[in-house]
Swiss-Prot record:
Annotated protein name in UniProt: Holliday junction branch migration complex subunit RuvB
Residues that bind ATP: L21, R22, G63, K66, T67, T68, E129, D130, Y131, R172, Y182, R219
Catalytic activity as recorded in UniProt: ATP + H2O = ADP + phosphate + H(+)
SMART domains: AAA (SM00382)
Subunit structure: Homohexamer. Forms an RuvA(8)-RuvB(12)-Holliday junction (HJ) complex. HJ DNA is sandwiched between 2 RuvA tetramers; dsDNA enters through RuvA and exits via RuvB. An RuvB hexamer assembles on each DNA strand where it exits the tetramer. Each RuvB hexamer is contacted by two RuvA subunits (via domain III) on 2 adjacent RuvB subunits; this complex drives branch migration. In the full resolvosome a probable DNA-RuvA(4)-RuvB(12)-RuvC(2) complex forms which resolves the HJ.
Organism listed in the record: Phytoplasma mali (strain AT)
InterPro entries: AAA+_ATPase (IPR003593), AAA_lid_4 (IPR041445), DNA_helicase_Holl-junc_RuvB (IPR004605), P-loop_NTPase (IPR027417), RuvB-like_N (IPR008824), RuvB_C (IPR008823), WH-like_DNA-bd_sf (IPR036388), WH_DNA-bd_sf (IPR036390)
One GO process term, biological-process aspect: DNA recombination
Binding site for DNA: R311, R316
Entry coiled-coil feature ranges: none
Length: 332
């Protein structure tokens, strides 16, 4: 299907708005005040010494801006930014090709760095420490080792699973930064900025309700804003108010606590199938038909933060808050 000029213009406008949502400098990056101050010092020091920034590991829950922050670092350093992921690195040749293409001072960003295969991870060690690649060529009987010099570069790794990063890899990062959940005040500023980008008004009461449902996460806040905006455009002449937001959030099955259907399925399973626990994560995953990694990375961080569950050596346990949520007085 061919797009006419009007359609192409609309798509271009949408892309531009999406781009404008993403901050491009540390000054524009909202929240994470202490982290920004520290990172700013590191960047200024590296530029003053005309050196590459030390390798940086960023960790924290999904949706807090790890990729955006990595892009900002490259922009602040005025260097090229290259991106890949741990899952995409299936063979040693993939990493060798990527590293060999780097220029002086480049930032190489590896998302989900905890998913790097061990054999590929080990190639990074000499690259990070000495800016060299040691490669073994040939067959089992006739092996030949060659060394390739690399220009100084900065590796930025991002992970939602800090504990899964091996000690040898973790120790090679000179800088390690943690992204924390955003405060309600910070999320208000982010949503207000988003409303300006989209030229869509939002009243104060609706703003606060949206913040409550954003789970301390900018990505969720912006996604909810866009979905409510869809309803406002169709049913309310583009105005986001309490009435239209309630309709949208009800359709999206997101309650006042920020819990959605997936959260309720998890918590209901924990209470009804396993009597509140303790129960192993694999049993919960099998019961609700979900991957263990998805539960650990997507569901549980917020449920733990808000006090709906606890992790113990014996397994997951539902808290009194969860039983109250389901109006069950039989608290184990």
């Amino acid at each position: 299907m061919k797009l006419n000029k009007n359609s192409e213009l609309k798509l271009s406008t949408i892309d531009e708005k999406e781009k404008n949502l993403r901050p491009e400098t540390l000054k524009e990056y909202m929240g994470q005040k202490n982290l920004k101050e520290i990172l700013s010092v590191y960047i200024k020091a590296a530029k003053k010494r005309k050196e590459s920034l030390e390798h940086l590991l960023i960790y924290g829950p999904p949706g807090l801006g790890k990729t955006t922050l990595a892009k900002i670092v490259a922009k602040e350093l005025n260097v090229n930014f290259k991106i890949t992921s741990g899952a995409a690195m299936e063979r040693s040749g993939d990493l060798v090709a990527t590293l060999s293409s780097l220029q002086m001072g480049d930032v190489l960003f590896i998302d989900e760095i905890h998913r790097l295969p061990k054999s590929i991870e080990e190639i990074l060690y000499s690259a990070m420490e000495d800016y060299v690649l040691d490669i073994v060529l040939g067959t089992e009987n006739e092996k030949k080792s060659i060394r390739i010099d690399l220009p100084p570069f900065t590796l930025i790794g991002a992970t939602t699973r800090f504990g899964d990063i091996s000690s040898p890899l973790r120790d090679r990062f000179g800088l390690i930064l943690k992204l924390n959940y955003y405060s309600e005040d910070e999320l208000e500023l982010i949503i207000k900025r988003t409303s300006l980008v989209y030229n869509t008004k939002i009243d104060n009461n609706t703003l606060k309700k949206l913040v409550k449902r954003s789970r301390g996460t900018p990505r969720i806040a912006n996604r909810l804003f866009r979905r409510i905006r869809d309803f406002a455009d169709v049913y309310n002449k583009g105005l986001i108010d309490e009435h239209i937001s309630e309709i949208a959030l009800e359709k999206l099955t997101i309650d006042k606590n920020g819990l959605d259907d997936a959260d309720y399925t998890y918590l209901k399973s924990l209470i009804e199938k396993f009597e509140g626990g303790p129960v192993g994560i694999k049993n919960i995953a099998a019961n609700i038909g979900e991957e263990v990694s998805t539960i650990e990375d997507i569901y549980e961080p917020y449920l733990l933060k808000e006090g709906y569950i606890k992790r113990t050596k014996r397994g997951r346990i539902a808290t009194p808050l969860t039983f109250k949520l389901f109006k069950n007085d039989k608290i184990k």
